[in-house]
Amino acid sequence: CDTPAGKYEFLGYVTREDGSVPNIGRWFDPAILSEESGNYLYYGFSPSFRFPGMETLEIPGAMMVKLADDMHTIISEPVCVANGYDTAKGTDYEEHPFFEASSIRKFGEWYYFVYSSQQMHELCYGMSKTPEGPFEYKGVIVSNGDIGYEGNELATNYYGNNHGGLVEINGKHYIFWHRHTHGRAFSRQGCADKVEILADGTIPQIEMTS
């Protein structure tokens, strides 16, 4: 497709050249980064529980594979770039393990991996100098209950799962995310807030706005 508005043509399932699919990580919530060094696909779902059919699946966390230029042939084996529930203990991800919602961006010399954590209200991020990671956990960008902002320990409103990503617009950076309305997990409202990228590349947690 030549424009983001579509219409899209189905190219095929993401598989190895022989048609097989790596049996590590849950193929869920994908994100793509394409640059001169290659095409990178990030994916993953890392719950503290197992759905039927997932009992024996190895789920280290957020996974990454390289794709051929056809964008659906896997040319590298999966590697874990951010620790999930099963592997976070003893790492910087221990309090905020990867859950789902992979999002990848590059600003300046840094690659930013944004994800929804096991805490079920926040978008966290890790940083790496390479798209292949691993991404060093750096903190929370936004909580849809403002938990953690300026020391808040209690939610300021109904909160729940969060998805989103970073965008640069006219030299400024924003986090797009969603909050929950009407006190229900399925009433979700898209939101955007400006973020500040500090000299060392880190992003302080922001207060959610209306």
Language-model features: where?
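Carbohydrate-active catalytic/glycan-binding domains of CAZyme proteins
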Residues: 1-210
